[in-house]
Structure formats: structure tokens, C-alpha cells
């Protein structure tokens, strides 16, 4: 195999080349395409589908513009009888059951379900059923309010980008009008062939001509016919198709324009999304943030799935790409995203594990450090880089070349204007098995610089290969050159054919030509997936393993002599088999004789079962549970470390009988160690066994066969072999490896009892899920159905069975202490109320045993500990990122020894913390984030409220220095309230600064809220929740999205072009969905009113008759034929442009100044995401400014501050009575429902309240009124605004808004009086003047 070229990379791990027969059978399929009409391509303006649809289709007339996987058969799997069931029968009047193995937790042979006479109705509804667990793993649906907010934000963004397109048309229209003014007439439109670069000029000119002759083009059909008469080429073919189909758009001019826009317009939203995609990189962000931003661009772009996968891989971090390309290629973008997130978690876990000693590191992460040759290089080049050796125009494109009908390869394609043809490197073609053809005669290479592709003659060429760039696809033939520095070179012929628009500076290439619109913008032919067309030879066997059917059919294997490994993807695996056979072979006997010789009887030590049972009874001593004070490293959850990140499981059940011959396995926990590869058996060879349909195989032989897989992606014990993987594609490869190994060693599996491609699996009494592990239903049913023990032997059997599963039960030692005390031989057996209560509590604890989540060392840990008179207990807790709630990772408990009872009270409180550090040192030692120890108020006060080391004994101080920990108070409601995170104020401020600097500059890339959130986003939400505990995080998130809306740009971009009625309609539509944020609504309304467009004359001193504003003139332009022919058109147009106001805001008060005015220089930044809290004092000042009287408003309420001053009451236009004026004002405020927070306090008490106000300077009423009266102009001066006219508009607007408030948006609190706004009665002539 040749080394890959330096500038090429595969989007994923390269799939094996199919056999020649498969290639021949599928020949010609690559040319199969699905014909679709040009108008049916992917919508370019996906973002413009929100608000535009609600407001109706907008005409672009300039006159109006100014206005689950397959698996085998499934059946319930029941565990075989065990010793516990046998002992139960002995205690129940001699009832008999079959005797099983000594380990009840290990699933053995599949037998039919037997009725359990002790099983209760609760046990039948046990929550650990597999079907129920799969439902629990389904993602939560997002909140309806969040979905509504995001939909509204997307609608606003759509409208914003649509207005950019209209502004471009307006710019073109202005240029055409100015040229027409100079020449005296409008030019005739040129023939439009379909080039998108000429579309705006063509369609605008046509509309101007149609508007100039309204009598000639009096109906829609004539207008459409005029435009069609000026079409040619591809555009004429598109219009001809509409005429042939008799489409309804022919008689509807606005619909025809919209259809034409969809086909020929290169919209601003698509342009911005493409620029964002090419510049998108993960950088130092979390993968979830990068993926969210990436996914927000996908609907707008509409690129093929494989192109999106290549761009997603290109922007990832180098360390993620390094391990991503070791895994087989995912078949979809969704699977790739899932795999990227899993690899990021694996890498974070690896960084945490590397802080441990080498001997303490788990084996399952060794694959991350295994040397694997690089297959591709993405980080060495970027699309906008240039080659230093090329002195002419050139650029690089991310091009996907479908080297065969089965998969594509992403390469760095050089677009060179000096190359005459399209070239491909010979080494690249050989590496990817590209089919080559010989030319009848050699051709010379003609390039401006022969050093790039060489000067040797060209003899070979390729068949047409599908090439993809963005949503542009074509079939290209390449000439093969021997010494090219680049994998693919696109020359001048390619440039002339497509005529792309090239930005040589940015390295961008976009396609607008009619040829591309007709032939290239269509969905590419899909890759041929051989597994989708395969037919399984056995019913129930997935078709991916149809060639390995002999592993499940021993009779077919006996008839055939095929011992060859699979030929479709497992050749590399089979090459390692002879070396294993050589290691397994005997020195005095050849390989063939050793393996082909059949044994007449299985090899098994005599009396192994008796010795094993004797060792088991000797090993477990109940006295140690009461007196031992040693805290050993806990097996669970360390046992399941290798399952972290596994989401796909396949359980294979071996045929025959598997016997255990080891003398060192005494307990159930010893079985777990062997099954999960924690204790690998050192075997150099094994004795042959009888090759038949149901053989008897020693357990050590199975482990020897799978010795290089156990602990990495396989666990095995008895007849069960569990294969697990991170991704679906990797899982196929792993299962195939195991089946090929079994076929080579003549080990057969039962197809009926095997389960393929599941998300949960049962193994050794456990239910394994992607999240964690929980107890099997049969284990729980056995314990909960156990009858009341009548003898010490019966109680001992129960405790021996339940003891290995103590890690799944909280406070196991505390619950079972009375039962263990009865097992002591020096005391008579007694069963009283205390023992019965402990027995019932043990059943209850197993029935409620939770799912133990996989601990993640990269995340923060929480310790919850406790101690009683007889035992201590601890719980290892983490936070679930998806739900935000606490999850348990492990439990530990033991009895307190007699020596520890004499310890001091302080040492007794620290004792469970020390024990937890001992048993979970693998996870808690050298953590990056501090371990938070949850204590109640009493313990927190006694432990100095800061550090435990103050009260530690001398011999414990050195031990505790190995751990980074801190203490905090235990939350009151442990089930509902999430655990708090302890952060410093400086860290929160730093996070806010980072969030402000890293805010996306484009709203089109804002991510939608998902169930999975990045750690950074969670930290920010939690810190905000700590600052504002009374507000939910969801509302802060929604307001955060609204805060990112560029109100200034929206107003200055398109609101300035509308009339007053249109502005009112747009604003009402926009704010109707934002009513439940009344504070934000008030500020937005104020901003709109302050940005009044007209400059009015300064009013004189207060007089009875105020100045009347001049009538607003219409800015519409009507071009009639008579006007065009006259000589006064220039004068008319000049006057029109002179009277037109500027297109930018003139009287604009910055939002920062306004927020600083009412909130002070600092708090407005802090409250940016909370929403502005407008107090009654603010509303009363507005009433005073606009001359409005306040009265009660139904359905609303105010929240007075304890230090709030009395709001002023407006008596007239200029006279204000403040708080210090008269005592009768206080009574009047009570009647009106406006409270000032002082109530009936005395004047001295009120003065004290004024003294308690913040020391920072707050604006006085006079400053506020002066600031509102004069607003800033463009020239830097101050312009007075017309109070009466502005007040009238504000009153109408607020009244219409508040009357449409929904009852459900009102806060759920007892109704009481609020405040409303009411217009003072005025004279009829004043009203008429204001109208």
C-alpha cells in the first residue's frame, strides 16, 4: 500500500475496497442520477421562511418595497437457578429446584421462565425493565416557550437578510435611474440567459419599465409575458417548462417574481452562511458549541451530507481529528456529530487519567496512545492559503472525489489558471483503487509551470468521477500524471466551462453561470452501500455478517473445509492469526496436529466444584463486616470503566458448555474480574477440545482466543460474550472481528439466543446502558422474593448472595447490621422486630437500587457522607449535563470497628470522608476541579466552615494533601434542586467578559438550545442563577437570545423606509409575541419613540396654542410616460432626493446612555440578560413628561422596593407635586393603587429610608425630564422633541399593546391593584391638530 499523498485526507477511515466481482456487478451505477427540475433544488434562503410567511408573501415590486437497526429474534432472557434458590427451597419445606452454578449473578444457559412464589406485584413492575430504560434515554423535548422564542428570532433574522436583498435591488434601481436621468430615458433590458450575477440589474430594470407603462401592462399575464420575452438560454428553458405545465404563476406576477427569485437570485442569507462556513473553526471552544454553530448553518446551505461531514472534520481540533480518523466512517452527519462528542469526552477523561500513576491507569484508554500512521493531513492547509511556488492566480478547494461508487475522498484540489486540463496524481489513484484506462496515444502536458505536474507524457486517464464542492456536483475525467505535487489539479478548461466567480484574495469560488444552474445544482448520486443490498443467508442474522453464517450453523461448517477468514474487510485481522497459533502450539507437536486432533473428553480438574465451594465458604467471614476498619479500593464503578462511551452492544451466546477450571475463582467478584479483563490468565497454549455442534470448552480457552480483545471492546464469561463500541460503524467491525476469531478456532454461537446491535444489554446480572449500569431484574426479584429466614444457614445464603451487589445500595452496612450480627456463631439465632425491619429494609433498598452512572473524572465530583452509631456511608455524586440534576455514581458503607468508636466527635465526622477518598482514590486524586463535600449546617459549622485539615489528626494530614477538596452546605431539597457550584466572583466576571468578547457577530450562526449543552454554557447559566436566584435559567437564556438582536441595525436598515402606519404595523407584529417581557417592551417602545424622524421647530414658552408640525409628504415616485417625455423630470427627481431624509438614524439616543441614565453606570451591564426592571417611579416620570394621569390597571401588579420613594403625581403639563409636598397626596396614592414602599411611616422614618439608599449618584427627576426633552442629533447638538405628538403616539401604542396581553402571561400571584396609563382630556381643536 502506498503512503497517502501529503495534501489529501479521507473524511473518515478508509473503507476497504470491494472485490472485483462486486465492482463489476455495480458498474455503471455511478452514472445513475435522479432528474429534478431546476426549480426543485435546495432552497437557498432557508432563513427567510419565518416572518415572511406570517406577514404574507412580499412582492419585490420596487413600488411596494418602498412600502432503529436490524437484529436477531429477541426473547426474554432469564438467569439460571443458583445456589440461593436451592437454599430457599431447603428453607421452604423441602421444595426442589434444579441446582445451578455457584454464582447467581452470572447468566448461564437460557431456560424458560419459572413462576416465583415469592414475587410480589411490585417486583413485576420493577423499573429496570429494558423497554422502560430505553424510553428513559429518549431526549427531552425542548420547552415550548424556548421553541417559540427561537422561532421568533429566526423570523427576525430572516426578515433582516431579506431586507438586505431588497436594499441591493434598491441600490441597483438608483443607479439605473441616475443613468436614465442623464440619458433622458430608461435603457432596454438585455436578454437574460440565467447568470445569477446579472439577475438584479435585469429584474429591477424590467420592473421600472413595467411601472412606467401601467396602461400597456395592465394585468399580470402581460407583465409576465414581457419578462419572458427577454429571457434566453437556460432561463428561457425554465420559463418554457412553466408554460408547458400551465403553472399558475403565469397569471400571478408576484408569484412569478418569487419563483424567479428562488431560481436565479443569489441571496444574502446564502452568501453570509457560506462565508461563515468557510471561516468556521472550533478553536478553543467545546465541541458542542462548534457543532451548534455548524448545525445552524446547515438548513441555509443545503449541501450534501458527505460535504458537510468533510467541512465539520476540517474545523475540528487537531487532537479530536487524530483519533476520529481511526474509527470507521459514519454513514451520516448525525452519527459523526455523536462520535465527535464521544471522542471529546474520551480525551477529557484521558487527560484526567494521565494525572494518575501509570500502574493505576485503566486499560481501556490505551488505544488512544497506540501508534497509528497518519492517513490524512487537514491542519497543514486551509482553503485560503496559497502555494509559495506558484506566481500566478491560484486557489485551493475542498473537493470530494468519489473514487469508486462506494465512498468519497476529500482532497486539496488546486485550481490553477496555468494548467490546461484536469490532472490526478498517479499515487493517489493507486492508493484509492481508481479504475484507469489507457489512451490510444500519449499526450504531452501543457502547463505554464511544468514543475507542478511534471513534463512526462500522459498515457492513462480515469473514468468520469463525481466531484462535489459545496452543493455543486459534476463528473470529471482526469489525466494521470506521475509526479504531481497535488492530488487533483483543475485547469483552464474547468474554469472556462463553469465560469465561476473567484475571489483570489479570500480563496472563494462561487458558481453563477447558466451551465451550473442547469447541470450542476442537483443532488449528487448516492454512494452505493453494499450492506444495504446484501441478503442474509440465515433468518435473523444481520446482513453485515452474512458471509460468517457458518459460525451460527455448525452443520454447514462441518460440511465445508473452509478455514479461510472473511475476504471483505477482515483480511488484516486474519493475518495476525498464524502468529497466535504459533504461540499456542506445542513445541513437541506441529500446529496442525495440535489443533485438528479431537479430544474424547473435556479436560477438567477433579473435584473442582467441591474445592471451590469450600474456598468460598472460607473466604467470606461475617465477623469482618462488623470489626474490619480497612477501606480497600472499590471494584464498582472501576469495573465498568471500559464501558464509558459505549452506545452499541451485541451479545453473542456460545453453543455447548463452558466449564471453569481455575482454582482461584471463589466469589462472584472474582468472576467479574476475569470477565472484564482485570485479571488476565497467563496461558501459552490450550488443549484441543472436541469440535462439534455443542462442545465442552474450558473457560480459559475462550479467554485465550479473545485475549487481545477483552477489556478493549469485549467482555466474556461463561456462554456470554458481550461486544461494545462507541459508534455503529465501529460496532460492525468489532463484531466481525469476534466472529472471524471464533470461526478460525471452531467456536460456534447460537443465533436464536444472540442479540445484535442493541443500546442495552444484560451481562452477569447487570443491565448495561450508555449512561451506566444497574442491577438485572432477576437479581432484584431473587432478593425481594426471598422468604423470611428461619435459620442461620438461610440467612447466610441470603447475605452471601446480596453482599457482592452492596455497591448498588445506599447505606448497605447500616441496613444489614442487625442481620450480620445474627450470623456470628457465638450467639444463638434470634429473629425479632429489629431483624424483621432490617430484612424488609434490605428488600426495599434493592427494589429502589438506582442506575449508577459512569463517573467522569473530567467533571466535578460531589461527596455526600454520613456516620451513625454503628456504620458510616458515602455517596459519589456528579451532575448530569442534560438534566442538570444530581446522579449517583457509587455507594460505599461499612460498619464502625470497636477501635473507631472511641474516636473524638470531630474524627468521627471526618472518618467517612477519609473512607470515601480511600475507596474512590482512582477518581478523586489529583482532580482539576475541587471535590465538593456536602455537609449539613451543624457539621459545616463544626468543621470550621472552610477546610477539614484544621481538625485532622496528625497521621491524616499527609493523606488529605493528595486531594483537592472543599466543603459546602448540602442543598435542602436534594431531589429537585440541582447541586450548586461554588465559584468566585472573579471567575464569574471573567466568564462574562469572555462571553461578551466571543459573542457571534452573525445572528445566522446562533445555536438553537439543545438537550446537550457545553460545560462553559452550563457554568455561565449557573453563575447567573447564583447572582439572580429568583429568576429561572430558562428565562435568562431566552432574554439572552433577544439581547443579541441588533435593534439599531434593524431600525436604521429598513424601518426608516416605511411610513408611520407601516412602522406601527411592523412593531405591533414584532412585540405581540414579546408581551410577557413587559420591561423589555417598555424600553423598546421608548427607544422607538425617541428615534422620531422629523426635526420640529423649538416650541416657545408654554402657551395655550402649541405649534403645529408640518404635514408629512409622501416619498413615492410615479414615473408616467408624460413625465418621461417632458424636460422637467430632472427637476422633479432632484426635488425628490432633496426632500428625502437620510437613510441612517439622525436622532438616536444610544441604548447604553439610556440604560446608564435609569440604572446607573454599573448595574445595566449586570442586568443585561435579566431584563430592565422598570419601577413605578420610572413610569410616573413618563406620566409627568407626557402629561398623563395614572390609574389602576387590571391584571398587572407592581413590586415596590423597600427603599423606593413616592412616585410623583402629574397635575398638569409643567407642574409636578413631589413626595415632600402635601400629606393628602399619600392618601390619594393609596386610592390609586400606587404604593411607594413607605406606607404610613412617619417623616423621620422616611428620612431614614432615604439615608439607606445606594451611595452612587442616581438621576433626579429634573435630570430625567431634561434628558427626555432634548435628544442628540447627528451634528452633535440637541434637538427638542414635540411632547404632545410623541405622547399621543406612545399612548396609542402602549394602550393597544396592553389590551392584547394574554391572561396566561400574568404572574401567578394574588390579584391586586396596579397602574394604567390614561390620556388627559384635551380640547377638540388640539386633538384635531395632532391628527
From Swiss-Prot:
The chain crosses the membrane at residues 1070-1090, 1117-1137. GO terms for cellular component: membrane. Its main location: membrane. Residues 1-123, 128-147, 556-595, 971-1033, 1309-1331 are annotated as: Disordered. It is a multi-pass membrane protein. It comes from the Eukaryota. Residues 109-123, 128-143, 569-578, 1015-1024, 1320-1331 have a biased composition (Acidic residues). Residues 19-30, 992-1001 have a biased composition (Low complexity). SUPFAM superfamilies: DNA/RNA polymerases. The keyword Cell membrane does not apply. Pfam families: DUF4939 (PF16297), RT_RNaseH_2 (PF17919). Plays an essential role in capillaries endothelial cells for the maintenance of feto-maternal interface and for development of the placenta. This is Retrotransposon-like protein 1. It comes from Bos taurus. The lineage of its organism: Eukaryota, Metazoa, Chordata, Craniata, Vertebrata. The gene is RTL1.
Amino acid at each position: 500500500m502506498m503512503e497517502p499523498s501529503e495534501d489529501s485526507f479521507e473524511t473518515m477511515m478508509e473503507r476497504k475496497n470491494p472485490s472485483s466481482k462486486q465492482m463489476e456487478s455495480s458498474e455503471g451505477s455511478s452514472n445513475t442520477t435522479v432528474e429534478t427540475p431546476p426549480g426543485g433544488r435546495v432552497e437557498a434562503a432557508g432563513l427567510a421562511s419565518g416572518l415572511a410567511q406570517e406577514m404574507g408573501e412580499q412582492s419585490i415590486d420596487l413600488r411596494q418595497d418602498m412600502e432503529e437497526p436490524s437484529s436477531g429474534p429477541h426473547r426474554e432472557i432469564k438467569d439460571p437457578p443458583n445456589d440461593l434458590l436451592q437454599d430457599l427451597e431447603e428453607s421452604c419445606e423441602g421444595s426442589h429446584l434444579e441446582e445451578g452454578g455457584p454464582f447467581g449473578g452470572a447468566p448461564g444457559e437460557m431456560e424458560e421462565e419459572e413462576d416465583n412464589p415469592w414475587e410480589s406485584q411490585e417486583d413485576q413492575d420493577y423499573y429496570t425493565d429494558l423497554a422502560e430504560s430505553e424510553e428513559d434515554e429518549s431526549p427531552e423535548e425542548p420547552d415550548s416557550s424556548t421553541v417559540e422564542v427561537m422561532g421568533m428570532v429566526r423570523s427576525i433574522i430572516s426578515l433582516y437578510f431579506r431586507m438586505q436583498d431588497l436594499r441591493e435591488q434598491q441600490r441597483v434601481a438608483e443607479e439605473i435611474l441616475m443613468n436614465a436621468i442623464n440619458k433622458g430615458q430608461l435603457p432596454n433590458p438585455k436578454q437574460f440567459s440565467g447568470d445569477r450575477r446579472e439577475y438584479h440589474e435585469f429584474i429591477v430594470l424590467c420592473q421600472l419599465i413595467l411601472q412606467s407603462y401601467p396602461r400597456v401592462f395592465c394585468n399580470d399575464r402581460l407583465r409576465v409575458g414581457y419578462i419572458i420575452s427577454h429571457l434566453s438560454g437556460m432561463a428561457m428553458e425554465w420559463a418554457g417548462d412553466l408554460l408547458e405545465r400551465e403553472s399558475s404563476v403565469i397569471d400571478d406576477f408576484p408569484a412569478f417574481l418569487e419563483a424567479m427569485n428562488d431560481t436565479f437570485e443569489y441571496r444574502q442569507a446564502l452568501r453570509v452562511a457560506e462565508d461563515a462556513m468557510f471561516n468556521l473553526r472550533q478553536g478553543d471552544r467545546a465541541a458542542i458549541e462548534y457543532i451548534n454553530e455548524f448545525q445552524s448553518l446547515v438548513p441555509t446551505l443545503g449541501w450534501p451530507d458527505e460535504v458537510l461531514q468533510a467541512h465539520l472534520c476540517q474545523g475540528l481540533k487537531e487532537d479530536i481529528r487524530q483519533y476520529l480518523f481511526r474509527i470507521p466512517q459514519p454513514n451520516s452527519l448525525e452519527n459523526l456529530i455523536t462520535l465527535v462528542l464521544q471522542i471529546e469526552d474520551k480525551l477529557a477523561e484521558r487527560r484526567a487519567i494521565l494525572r494518575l500513576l501509570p500502574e493505576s491507569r485503566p486499560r481501556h484508554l490505551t488505544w488512544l496512545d497506540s501508534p497509528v500512521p497518519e492517513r490524512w493531513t487537514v491542519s497543514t492547509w486551509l482553503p485560503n492559503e496559497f502555494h509559495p511556488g506558484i506566481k500566478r492566480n491560484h486557489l485551493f478547494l475542498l473537493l470530494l472525489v468519489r473514487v469508486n461508487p462506494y465512498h468519497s475522498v476529500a482532497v486539496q484540489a488546486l485550481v490553477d489558471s496555468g494548467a490546461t486540463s484536469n490532472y490526478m496524481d498517479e499515487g493517489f489513484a493507486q492508493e484509492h483503487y481508481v479504475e484507469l484506462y489507457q489512451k490510444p496515444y500519449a499526450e504531452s502536458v501543457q502547463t505554464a509551470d511544468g514543475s507542478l505536474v511534471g513534463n512526462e507524457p500522459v498515457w492513462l486517464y480515469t473514468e468520469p468521477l463525481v466531484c462535489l464542492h459545496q452543493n455543486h456536483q459534476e463528473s470529471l475525467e482526469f489525466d494521470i500524471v506521475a509526479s504531481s505535487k497535488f492530488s487533483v489539479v483543475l485547469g483552464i478548461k474547468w474554469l472556462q466551462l463553469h465560469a465561476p466567480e473567484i475571489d483570489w484574495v479570500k480563496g472563494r469560488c462561487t458558481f453563477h453561470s447558466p451551465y451550473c444552474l442547469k447541470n450542476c445544482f442537483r443532488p449528487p448520486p448516492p454512494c452505493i452501500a453494499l450492506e444495504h443490498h446484501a441478503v442474509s443467508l440465515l433468518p435473523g442474522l444481520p446482513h453485515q455478517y452474512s458471509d460468517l453464517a457458518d459460525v451460527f450453523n455448525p452443520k454447514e461448517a462441518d460440511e465445508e473445509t473452509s478455514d479461510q477468514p472473511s475476504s471483505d474487510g477482515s483480511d488484516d485481522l486474519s493475518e495476525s492469526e498464524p502468529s497466535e497459533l504459533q504461540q499456542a502450539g506445542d513445541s513437541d507437536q506441529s500446529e496442525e496436529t495440535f489443533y485438528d486432533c479431537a479430544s474424547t473428553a473435556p479436560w477438567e480438574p477433579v473435584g473442582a466444584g467441591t474445592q471451590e465451594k469450600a474456598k468460598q465458604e472460607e473466604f467470606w467471614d461475617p465477623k469482618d463486616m462488623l470489626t474490619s476498619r480497612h477501606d480497600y479500593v472499590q471494584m464498582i464503578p472501576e469495573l465498568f470503566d471500559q464501558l464509558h462511551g459505549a452506545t452499541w452492544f451485541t451479545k453473542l451466546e456460545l453453543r455447548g458448555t463452558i466449564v471453569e477450571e481455575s482454582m482461584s475463582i471463589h466469589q462472584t467478584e472474582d468472576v467479574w474480574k476475569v470477565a472484564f479483563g482485570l485479571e488476565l490468565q497467563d496461558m501459552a497454549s490450550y488443549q484441543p477440545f472436541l469440535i462439534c455442534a455443542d462442545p465442552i470448552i474450558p473457560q480459559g480457552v475462550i479467554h485465550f482466543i479473545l485475549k487481545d480483545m477483552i477489556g478493549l471492546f469485549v467482555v466474556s464469561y461463561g456462554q456470554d460474550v458481550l461486544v461494545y463500541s462507541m459508534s455503529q460503524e465501529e460496532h460492525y467491525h468489532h463484531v466481525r472481528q469476534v466472529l472471524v476469531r471464533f470461526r478460525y478456532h471452531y467456536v460456534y454461537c447460537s443465533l436464536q439466543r444472540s442479540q445484535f446491535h442493541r443500546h442495552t444489554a444484560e451481562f452477569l446480572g447487570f443491565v448495561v446502558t450508555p449512561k451506566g449500569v444497574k442491577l438485572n431484574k432477576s437479581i432484584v426479584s431473587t432478593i425481594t422474593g426471598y422468604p423470611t429466614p428461619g435459620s442461620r444457614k438461610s440467612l447466610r445464603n441470603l447475605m452471601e448472595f446480596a453482599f457482592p451487589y452492596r455497591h448498588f445500595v445506599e447505606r448497605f452496612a447500616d441496613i444489614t447490621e442487625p442481620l450480620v450480627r445474627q450470623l456470628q456463631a457465638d450467639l444463638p439465632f434470634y429473629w425479632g422486630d429489629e431483624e424483621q425491619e432490617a430484612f424488609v429494609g434490605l428488600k426495599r433498598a434493592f427494589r429502589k437500587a438506582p442506575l449508577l452512572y459512569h463517573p467522569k473524572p473530567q467533571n466535578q465530583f460531589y461527596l455526600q457522607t454520613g456516620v451513625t452509631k454503628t456504620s458510616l456511608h458515602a455517596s459519589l455524586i456528579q451532575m448530569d449535563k442534560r438534566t442538570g440534576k444530581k446522579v449517583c455514581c457509587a455507594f460505599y458503607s461499612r460498619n464502625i470497628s470497636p477501635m473507631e468508636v472511641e474516636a473524638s466527635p470531630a474524627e468521627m465526622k471526618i472518618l467517612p470522608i477519609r473512607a470515601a477518598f480511600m475507596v474512590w482514590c482512582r477518581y478523586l486524586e489529583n482532580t482539576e476541579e475541587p471535590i465538593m463535600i456536602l455537609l449539613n449546617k451543624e457539621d459545616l459549622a463544626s468543621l470550621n466552615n472552610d477546610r477539614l485539615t484544621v481538625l485532622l489528626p496528625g497521621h491524616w494530614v499527609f493523606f488529605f494533601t493528595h486531594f483537592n477538596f472543599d466543603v459546602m452546605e448540602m442543598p435542602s431539597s436534594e431531589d429537585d434542586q440541582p447541586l450548586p457550584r461554588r465559584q468566585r466572583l472573579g471567575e464569574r466576571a471573567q466568564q462574562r467578559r469572555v462571553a461578551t468578547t466571543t459573542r457571534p457577530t452573525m445572528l445566522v450562526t446562533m445555536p438553537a438550545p439543545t438537550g446537550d449543552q457545553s460545560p462553559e454554557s452550563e457554568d455561565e447559566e449557573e453563575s447567573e442563577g447564583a447572582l439572580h436566584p429568583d429568576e429561572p435559567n430558562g428565562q435568562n437564556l431566552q432574554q439572552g437570545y433577544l439581547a443579541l438582536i441588533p435593534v439599531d441595525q434593524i431600525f436604521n436598515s429598513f424601518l426608516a423606509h416605511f411610513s408611520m402606519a407601516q412602522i406601527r404595523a411592523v412593531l405591533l407584529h414584532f412585540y405581540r409575541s414579546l408581551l410577557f417581557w413587559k420591561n423589555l417592551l417598555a424600553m423598546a417602545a421608548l427607544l422607538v419613540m425617541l428615534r422620531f424622524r422629523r426635526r420640529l421647530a423649538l416650541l416657545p414658552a408654554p402657551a395655550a396654542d402649541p405649534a403645529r408640525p408640518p404635514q408629512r409628504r409622501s416619498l413615492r415616485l410615479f414615473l408616467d410616460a408624460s413625465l418621461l417625455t417632458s424636460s422637467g423630470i430632472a427637476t422633479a427627481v432632484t426635488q425628490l432626493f432633496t426632500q428625502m431624509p437620510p437613510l441612517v438614524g439622525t436622532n438616536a439616543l444610544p441604548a447604553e446612555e439610556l440604560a446608564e441614565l435609569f440604572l446607573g453606570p454599573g448595574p445595566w451591564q449586570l442586568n443585561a440578560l435579566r431584563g430592565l426592571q422598570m419601577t413605578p417611579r420610572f413610569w410616573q416620570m413618563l406620566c409627568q413628561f407626557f402629561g398623563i394621569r395614572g390609574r389602576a390597571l387590571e391584571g398587572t401588579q407592581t413590586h415596590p422596593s423597600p427603599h423606593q420613594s413616592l412616585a410623583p403625581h402629574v397635575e398638569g403639563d409643567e407642574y409636578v407635586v413631589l413626595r415632600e409636598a402635601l400629606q393628602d397626596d399619600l392618601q390619594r396614592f393609596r386610592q390609586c393603587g400606587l404604593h411607594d414602599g413607605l406606607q404610613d411611616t412617619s417623616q423621620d422614618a422616611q428620612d431614614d429610608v432615604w439615608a439607606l439608599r445606594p451611595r452612587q449618584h442616581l438621576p433626579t427627576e429634573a435630570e430625567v425630564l431634561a434628558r427626555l426633552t432634548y435628544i442628540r442629533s447627528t451634528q452633535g447638538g440637541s434637538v427638542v422633541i414635540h411632547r404632545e405628538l410623541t405622547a399621543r403616539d406612545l399612548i396609542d401604542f402602549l394602550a393597544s399593546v396592553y389590551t392584547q396581553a394574554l391572561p396566561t402571561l400574568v404572574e401567578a400571584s394574588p390579584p391586586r391593584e396596579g397602574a394604567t396609563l390614561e390620556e388627559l382630556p384635551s380640547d377638540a381643536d388640539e386633538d384635531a391638530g395632532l391628527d
